[in-house]
């Protein structure tokens, strides 16, 4: 039985103001069933950042984990691309 069937998402850090927590904006695309046009959906996830390495604007990879708080169910896996200021 495989244990690692967890969701892995890629998104952009929109907030790093909380202690050891980042807010990640994940954008997905779906085709509209009637109009056949791609529609962009976005959702924000709170993720645990133990070493506080992610900064605002970074492109990051997050993975689903056990609930760490009321709204935090993801953890930071790695920073894919640093933000250019």
From Swiss-Prot:
Disulfide bridge positions per record: none
Entry annotated with the keyword Phosphoprotein: no
Parts forming coiled coils: none
GO cellular component, one term: cytosolic small ribosomal subunit
Gene Ontology terms: biological process: translation
One Pfam family named in its UniProt record: Ribosomal_S17
Gene3D superfamilies per record: Nucleic acid-binding proteins
Subunit structure comment from the entry: Part of the 30S ribosomal subunit.
Family: Belongs to the universal ribosomal protein uS17 family.
Record's function text: One of the primary rRNA binding proteins, it binds specifically to the 5'-end of 16S ribosomal RNA.
Name of this chain's protein: Small ribosomal subunit protein uS17
